[in-house]
Amino acid sequence: MKTLFLLAILALVASTTFAQYSVGGGYNDVGGGGGSQQCPQERPNLGSCKDYVMERCFTMKDFPLTWPTKWWKGGCEQEVREKCCQQLSQIAPQCRCDAIRGVIQGKLGGIFGIGGGDVFKQIQRAQILPSKCNMGADCKFPSGYYW
């Protein structure tokens, strides 16, 4: 019974993903990123932004530990955010929201996007990255758009 349930959920996730790509459009149609035609096709390196959104720390002082770790109050949140802001500053303003969405796409919520994380909180963290970095207004991803 569990296997059947897991297969049904996996099929639902796969069909949703397929429908998302076959329908077309994207969050830029809703607003909050705009101008994706002028943006480069390749995804910029925003690894620190992904770590910031997912609340992970990767620093040299954690070198022997290679697995992602949750940060703690007073830990490395500020360091990761500063690296993220530095990476975002190298992207054209009209392309930032598209780049942020692209870097976290498929990374939310654990395995296959099911459980394992607070997806709503992570999406909110991604949307407010530009204002956290003093780079303009927040991104606006469509509601219910969980990749």
From Swiss-Prot:
GO cellular component: extracellular region; membrane
Keywords associated with the record: Antibiotic, Antimicrobial, Disulfide bond, Membrane, Plant defense, Secreted, Signal, Toxin
Highest taxon, organism lineage: Eukaryota
Cross-referenced Gene3D superfamilies: Plant lipid-transfer and hydrophobic proteins
Example of a GO MF term: serine-type endopeptidase inhibitor activity
Pfam families with a match to the protein in the record: Tryp_alpha_amyl
Pro-piece positions: 20-28
Processing after translation: Five disulfide bonds are present.
Cleaved signal peptide residues: 1-19
Name of the protein this chain belongs to: Hordoindoline-B1
CDD domains membership: AAI_SS
SMART domains: AAI (SM00499)
Gene from which the chain derives: HINB-1
Subcellular location: Membrane; Secreted, Extracellular space
Function: Acts as a membranotoxin, probably through its antibacterial and antifungal activities, contributing to the defense mechanism of the plant against predators. Forms monovalent cation-selective ion channels in membranes. Contributes to grain texture and hardness.
InterPro entries, per the entry: Allergen/soft/tryp_amyl_inhib (IPR006106), Bifun_inhib/LTP/seed_sf (IPR036312), Bifunc_inhib/LTP/seed_store (IPR016140), Glia_glutenin (IPR001954)
Tissue distribution of the protein: Found in endosperm and aleurone layer of developing kernels, but not in the embryo.
Record GO biological process: defense response to bacterium
